[in-house]
Amino acid sequence: RPIHENNPHYAVLDVRQVGAALQNDGYDGITLKKGEKYDFSCFARLADDGKGSKVIVCLLDQEGNEVAKASVKVSSKDWKQLKAVLTAQEDVQAAKLSLQPAGTGTYHFDLVSLFPQNTFKGRKNGLRADLAQALADLHPRFVRFPGGCVAHGDGVDNIYDWKGSIGPLEARKPLRNLWGYHQTRGLGYFEYFQFC
């Protein structure tokens, strides 16, 4: 069963031998700045065969070396939100996020998130500070959201509906876009209004 009816898909990691990991490269890699803190969160649960285990959460550089590390514990067959803070030990241009259970079993993960603590106006899950500040410095009289192809989609079933972009992140209805990738809608109407 999914975490929410609007969000029916989640990752299943069947660990038969310790060492298996779920990794995400981000969009062209995750940029890390030495000394900065990054908030990790995800929803996780055990499948029926699971016994529970610590999960090592780490950020890896291009060579696979750990540059930040924390751990969370998956111990329930119900969805639970897990959180950790990772501190980058060095600058990395194209890091990847890795989730590695310390025990065998089947793990379910959803809404895996990594955000810098240094966001525009310090908002949790906020906008990238440098980009948002550059836009704010222009003092625009209006901003369009959603814009372009996101607004009209590729048909009636894919038109942007603002109601799917508000509320708890895990309850927001994901949307595929014309560029061929998936949007969680973590940046929805509420976040855009906050920015404005």
Residue ranges and their predicted role:
Residues Y189-C196:
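A structural motif corresponding to the C-terminal end of an alpha-helix
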Residues R1-L187:
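Extracellular and organelle-lumenal recognition/adhesion modules and their flexible linkers in secreted
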